[in-house]
Amino acid sequence: MHKYQTHFVEHSVVKILSSTGKKHIALVAGGMSAEREVSLVSSAGVSKALIELGYKVTFVDMGADIAVKLQEINPDIVFNCLHGTYGEDGCLPGLLNIMRIPYTHSGLLSSALAFDKIHFRSCVLKNNINIADSIVVSKSDHINTDPMKRPYVIKPLKQGSSIGVEVIFEEDDFNFTDYDFPYGEDIIIEQYIQGQELQVALLNGKALGVLEIKLLKNRFYDYETKYNEGFAEHVCPAPLPANLYKKLLIESEKIYKTINCKGPVRAEFILEEQTNKLYVLEINTHPGMTPLSIVPEIAAYAGINFTNLIEEIIKMASFES
């Protein structure tokens, strides 16, 4: 049994958090993805900020009947606090476009492009931005040897929060024939790049700053490291030469514009040790809003506190015609 599982939930759970306010916000979180718990932690801080800002807030733990529940609630805006499938992959934005309800974060196509690692890679390469070499491997290929020279990274095609990500080093006792494809029939195998982990926060198309991740325990920036204290040190701003810092901001804004994102985004890069070459790893159109999350931390460095960050995200709410 794998630690992180999707699960079907028939009925949404609705809870009124604040019954009066200037606008009615439906805070949609939880859901049916493997990132359910992260979403719920993010929603706790977001709900508090929305109430402080004077909004009427209804919390919705998303189930399969989400469309019916939203019709009953009739919100002015949906705050999309879902992570992973059904929210971050474009499903909820697509539904809200049909229902003509304004929502936060990126739209259907932008979310889908960023969430699918193959399509994201294609977008990045067309814009001459460096990305690690990779191949797609299917379960039906029945590969019984390493599909790429070690070290390499195994990634599910469509997961976030580093769920399902494994790094295979030269010394590891790992046989690819034993890999059981827990998150779908296809995976992406990516060249592992040793270097400096760098994160960029963006808000409404503008890069706010760069943060460095220094690993303290685990070998890579995995789920455990992202969501537990004491596994990584955050250095903000990242200690980089001015020209390199500026390049990161420019590259991030270019990707944001290419994919046509909206609201908050987090971009992940690696600065390769040997060549000093920058590689983009991914962008996240639904970055975490937990106490350990990177976008709120960089925003604070840029002079935007958490409550104001949530207000800015709300201001950009819209649906696609």
Curated annotation (Swiss-Prot):
Keyword Nucleotide-binding part of the UniProt annotation: yes
Annotated Mg(2+) 2 binding sites: E282, N284
Coiled-coil boundaries: none
Molecular functions per Gene Ontology: ATP binding; D-alanine-D-alanine ligase activity; metal ion binding
Binding site for Mg(2+) 1: E268, E282
Cofactor note: Binds 2 magnesium or manganese ions per subunit.
Documented EC number(s): 6.3.2.4
Key word Coiled coil present: no
Class of enzymatic activity (EC top level): ligase
Residues that bind ATP: 148-199
Listed Pfam families: Dala_Dala_lig_C, Dala_Dala_lig_N
Pathway where it operates: Cell wall biogenesis; peptidoglycan biosynthesis
Its biological purpose: Cell wall formation.
Protein's recorded name: D-alanine--D-alanine ligase
Lineage: Bacteria, Pseudomonadati, Pseudomonadota, Alphaproteobacteria, Rickettsiales
